Amino acid sequence: MGKRVNYIAVALTTNCNYNCFYCKETGESINSVSKGTWDFEELKKVLKIAYEEGLSTFRLTGGEPTMVNYFQELIEYIMHLGKDTKIRLNTNGYKLKKFLDTIEFYKNRIDVMISVDSLNEYVNGFHYPKYLSRNIEELAKELIARGISTRFNIVVTKANYSEIKELIKKSIDLGVNVKLLDLIVRNEYLGNNTKVHDLDALTFGELIYQDFKELKSYLASESSRTQDRHYVSNGNGIPMSAYFFGNQWVQVKDSSRGATYAKECTNCSYKSICYEGVFSPILSVGEILNISGCMNKDFYYILKGKTETEIRSYFNEILKMFDHTELKSMKH
């Protein structure tokens, strides 16, 4: 058994100021009918238990996490759970400026990851609200000037592929690191003007999916060195490689390389369409503990109304799945 996972995602809210075509209605929260925001008092109870069970790195996501009215207090709460706690913030930059002083104060323990998918707001008939606007450029410059670890997350599809190389160059010039993610083909998307589900969603995802073969070759030729495995805080899920440009790097999350799966995944009815494997536990809106991206309801643990003892047992059930994982490919 390896070192137990110490990383958990927290989907604070399903609310978002944008509607990106590759996202789903509830964001990273797993339940398609549970919408809204975690109650702060209930969340604090669960986070305390999570920390006591060995989870010390908290990835805050949504929806858009900076929209919750207790965001400032949440940062302080997590930072005071213990001296070893860390926050990884997934955001589109909305309201982020309000919290820069606090983030700077804890900058040795907080990473900021801004979603930026294109140079222009409209690309090849697709709306990209998370583009490299002047506001985002200025925000990135301020984060770097304050010494805050900053990364752009870029979801690559056929729609924005023509802009990716220039976007990488501009990102490096700004001083931020980059993570490239291929599209996860799944059974639900907000879609390009129309929501798509089930078979229609799978077809939509396959149509706009862009492989990384040519892009990785380009990065290898442009970078000073490469690394086959490069992890910042969590080595589970899809293996990630890196390409270095001086002190900066471009990390590539490429699902064609397979993913780490638990033994419980072997007989799962969703395994043929699951490309993420077991990446991390996640707290979803609706007070649900599950595995990020997992569609199997056998591994959804409803925390609402449960005792502390029951919640601890659920965490242990989830965490045990990460004790024995194996790299496999489910793609054919």
Language model regions located:
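Canonical Radical SAM [4Fe-4S] cluster-binding loop centered on the CxxxCxxC motif
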Residues: 1-40, 53
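Radical SAM/AdoMet-radical enzyme domain recognition
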Residues: 8, 37-60, 68-181
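Flexible, acidic/Gly-rich N-terminal and inter-domain linker regions that tether
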Residues: 1-7, 18-22, 216-231, 296-297, ...
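Radical SAM enzyme [4Fe-4S]-AdoMet core and its adjacent flexible, acidic
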Residues: 122-260
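Flexible mid-to-C-terminal extensions adjoining Fe-S/redox cofactors in radical SAM and related proteins
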Residues: 258-332
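A short, flexible beta-alpha/helix-coil linker loop
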Residues: 27-31, 119-121, 185-186, 297-300
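Short functional micro-motifs and their immediate structural scaffolds
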Residues: 21, 25-28, 196-199, 273
